[in-house]
């Protein structure tokens, strides 16, 4: 393989250039995000699950249905003693309109979910579809798209 002179002098430049070219090529295949027929809320009871939270958030943010327009996440920290709160706050800072963080003393999953529902009602988010997903569960990329498609067909 023949390398251009500028690549011969700095092999790391060659690999960086190659990586950038590959990223630009792959961008054309990035899946399209869809606007939803409905809006959805996830209420999640969080207790000492820091090792799962990044994957949990990614599975929700990367939904085929557009996260910013259609999905709200209410994370209720049930008195976690690990780094869960900081991880949630990191994502909340990035998506302040979509992610709410609530803290309560440890009282169990049911009380956390009830607090999330209370928050939803008090803040009048006007969203009718609620699901409960635990932070150690990861949603398929098409989860909300499929639910939304089904509900749209039922209402027509």
Predicted regions and their residues:
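A conserved acidic beta->alpha catalytic loop
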Residues: 59, 77-86, 108
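Short beta-strand-to-loop acidic/aromatic patch adjacent to the donor-nucleotide binding site
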Residues: 124-138
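Conserved donor NDP-sugar-binding/catalytic core segment of glycosyltransferases
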Residues: 142-156
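Short beta-strand/loop segment that forms part of the nucleotide-sugar
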Residues: 69-79, 100-105, 135
